[in-house]
Amino acid sequence: MDAIKKKMQAMKLEKDNAIDKADTCENQAKDANSRADKLNEEVRDLEKKFVQVEIDLVTAKEQLEKANTELEEKEKLLTATESEVATQNRKVQQIEEDLEKSEERSTTAQQKLLEATQSADENNRMCKVLENRSQQDEERMDQLTNQLKEARMLAEDADTKSDEVSRKLAFVEDELEVAEDRVRSGESKIMELEEELKVVGNSLKSLEVSEEKANQRVEEFKREMKTLSIKLKEAEQRAEHAEKQVKRLQKEVDRLEDRLFNEKEKYKAICDDLDQTFAELTGY
């Protein structure tokens, strides 16, 4: 009877130990399942972050392509502006050449007028000399008269030439006035061109600033893409690590479930032994 009691106590102790082990295994299984759920949640979060990173990367690429397109358009505009500036410079150079030619023609006309005036003065002086000589020497009157006629003819010729020179001078003055008008128009055009050049210069400065900003944005996009690539790589590594950890915990859960199943089987066997023992004692 004492042996049976000892056996029952031993079986009860073994039963209690089995129950404790089963509870421990269940708690460990719950903890493992909780950690597995937490890791699965982290994996889902990482997958969401990974998707967001891919979206951000696509957006960054689109913005980079847009910046490149804007930069190309600005470069085309800059080329067209430089071509327009070169055309305006050629026009200014042509106006300056026309002005120089007008000044040369004006100088030539003034020189011819001076020569004609000097010739007329010389003829008048000769006439005075001939008149004085006619008073002093009557014998030479005819000669002087002829000379006077010749002088008058020369004077008339000089007057004719003077009239022609005057007409030419008037024509030259008209040309000079036209040239001055062209000069004034050219100066006005030059002022307009200077204003246009200022506007073009400001546009060029604005384009340079825009290009610098575009380059800065490109560099920022590159740095951001590099950062996103690093984050993506880190996320992939974390996801891979999490998957490995999930697999390891799943194996641990499977092992604990197997252990729990074995403990339950042992507990069931002990209960069966106890029931059988009680049945034997009762039957005894």
Curated annotation (Swiss-Prot):
Region (Disordered): 82-110
Keyword Hydrolase attached: no
Primary gene name: Tm2
The name this protein goes by in its record: Tropomyosin-2
Matches recorded under PANTHER family: TROPOMYOSIN
Quaternary assembly: Homodimer.
Family recorded in the similarity comment: Belongs to the tropomyosin family.
GO terms under biological process: actin filament organization; heart development; muscle contraction; positive regulation of sarcomere organization
Organism: Drosophila melanogaster
GO CC terms, sorted: actin filament
